[in-house]
Amino acid sequence: MTVYFIGAGPGAADLITVRAQRIIAASPVCLYAGSLVPQELLAECPEGARVIDTARLSLDEIVALLIEADAAGQDVARLHSGDPSIFSAVAEQVRRLESAGVAYQVVPGVPAFTAAAASLGRELTVPGVSQSIVLTRVSTLSTAMPEGEDLRSLGRSGATMVVHLGAHRIDQIAEELIEDYGRDCPAAVVAFASRPDEIVLRGTLATIADQVKAAGVTKTAVVIVGRVLAAEGFPDSYLYSATRERTTH
């Protein structure tokens, strides 16, 4: 049997992938990460399925449930918000399943930062402006940043900066990025991306902290900083060049 780590997307239930929806509908056991997972998705679970909210469970308790289901010959749909490859806390579960000899698969989902970019109506890689994206977070008591991965160090690249799990540290984020990006650099914060209660804030590094505080945003938000957010007059991609040799593949 198999444990499926499923990316449930950023918030809107209809952003789930077709593959994920199919697996959920066929799994007799479904574990989901509390309010971070769209509740509508739970309706996809088959009748009689064991549906468990893991928000208050420890890692040991969660893994025990996964191993128990495997021993009973049951597939498990393990739902995480966003995409399992980014700040999902899936690695710890995978490590233990491998030690226990339990088969697993990872099913990708729509990450929060792409949903945030969609809400802003902006591409995060624009020709001549930025062709790189830094996905990061700020240091917390629970998770310290490795040496060299602080915002000041990462900001020296000038790349489009995407900060997860950092709305409550918006003052720190702005302060550490202003030196390399400038006070007038466009900045945006999208909370609850793709959900009905989504909040979109646009400003600059000089103003965004006050905007975030005024809106009462403290969690479930993505901070995006970079010139791409207001880019104009950039060159067209060579993809559209009339001189480019085109093929059918």
Swiss-Prot record:
Alphabetized Pfam families for the sequence: TP_methylase
The protein's name in its UniProt record: Precorrin-4 C(11)-methyltransferase
Keywords: Cobalamin biosynthesis, Methyltransferase, S-adenosyl-L-methionine, Transferase
SUPFAM superfamilies: Tetrapyrrole methylase
Catalysis performed (reactions): precorrin-4 + S-adenosyl-L-methionine = precorrin-5 + S-adenosyl-L-homocysteine
GO aspect biological process, one term: methylation
Gene3D superfamilies according to UniProt: Cobalt-precorrin-4 Transmethylase, Domain 1, Methyltransferase, Cobalt-precorrin-4 Transmethylase, Domain 2
Sequence similarity: Belongs to the precorrin methyltransferase family.
Source organism superkingdom: Bacteria
